[in-house]
Amino acid sequence: MAADGTLSRGGVGEAVEEEHPGALEPGAAPFGNFPHYSRFHPPEQRLRLLPPELLRQLFPPEGPEKRPILGLDVGCNSGDLSVALYKHFLSPRDGETCSGASRELRILCCDIDPVLVERAERDCPFPEALTFITLDIMDQESRKVPLSSFLSQFGRSVFDMVFCMSVTMWIHLNHGDRGLCEFLAHVSSLCSYLLVEPQPWKCYRAAARRLRKLGLHSFDHFRSLAIRGDMAKQIVRILTQDHGMELACCFGNTSWDRSLLLFRAKHTHETQAIPESSTKETRTD
């Protein structure tokens, strides 16, 4: 995620900066929009925690006309994870064609970095299903039209699922406690289900330390943040206590120690039990 005006998913950089300090471009760290993020944290690490049938079970077909499942991927970077999620959730089942599966899911993928978005558009193997746009999700004015325009194409007012994968830290560092809370309030208002991969606090410290080593300014809000410590629990608290969400499932932790948390809007009707992850990792800390 690009943290400056907002997000760009490279939000992955914090862990990379600790493990591969020479691999990141110096100017990228403050925004999180690392150009080769998937080389260090491949999509497969997240996918192994997410049941392939998750979307099918959460959103079963209604009637003979199957309306598409609508997703929003916030901080999509160069689209590697967006494409991987699409293929993972819609891999054809026995007797099902690829073309039939591809009509079931449409994802709007946004990032603040136009260079990464251009790369995502150029390399996307599913242009009919994945739409990439340059967007500052923290800009309350500029985000309205593209989000509502996408939804209106399908006669919808909210997304079925919003994906926030390793973006919360960059929002928090660049916009402070208030910005993080505003971001969570906004994305939770946009969907029935919200999948969040929060960065742990150690990644905040690593991001600030890396900037100091490079001789760059530190994040303005870092030392004044009151929301700190166990960030997964903090985000659960904010979403459940303040924004009408409930924690539906924790799918476990990635190998770089980030939990995948699925939230459900309380007004959402639970039609199916959430399938269990294929792994046995269940920690939320």
Curated annotation (Swiss-Prot):
S-adenosyl-L-methionine binds at R46, N77, D111, D136, I137, M165. It comes from the Eukaryota. One of its GO terms (molecular function) is tRNA methyltransferase activity. It catalyses: a 5'-end 5'-phospho-ribonucleoside-RNA + S-adenosyl-L-methionine = a 5'-end (5'-methylphospho)-ribonucleoside-RNA + S-adenosyl-L-homocysteine; a 5'-end 5'-phospho-ribonucleoside-RNA + 2 S-adenosyl-L-methionine = a 5'-end (5'-bismethylphospho)-ribonucleoside-RNA + 2 S-adenosyl-L-homocysteine. GO terms for biological process: negative regulation of pre-miRNA processing; pre-miRNA processing; tRNA methylation. The keyword Coiled coil does not apply. Keywords: Cytoplasm, Methyltransferase, S-adenosyl-L-methionine, Transferase. It holds the Pfam family Bin3. InterPro entries: Bin3-like, Bin3_C, BIN3_SAM-bd_dom, SAM-dependent_MTases_sf. GO terms for cellular component: cytoplasm; cytosol; nucleoplasm; plasma membrane. It is found in: Cytoplasm. Gene3D superfamilies: Vaccinia Virus protein VP39. Residues 53-275 form the Bin3-type SAM domain. Its EC number is 2.1.1.-. Interacts with DICER1; the interaction may be mediated by RNA. PANTHER family: BICOID-INTERACTING PROTEIN RELATED (PTHR12315), RNA 5'-MONOPHOSPHATE METHYLTRANSFERASE (PTHR12315:SF1). Belongs to the methyltransferase superfamily. O-methyltransferase that specifically monomethylates 5'-monophosphate of cytoplasmic histidyl tRNA (tRNA(His)), acting as a capping enzyme by protecting tRNA(His) from cleavage by DICER1. Also able, with less efficiently, to methylate the 5' monophosphate of a subset of pre-miRNAs, acting as a negative regulator of miRNA processing. The 5' monophosphate of pre-miRNAs is recognized by DICER1 and is required for pre-miRNAs processing: methylation at this position reduces the processing of pre-miRNAs by DICER1. This is RNA 5'-monophosphate methyltransferase. The lineage of its organism: Eukaryota, Metazoa, Chordata, Craniata, Vertebrata.
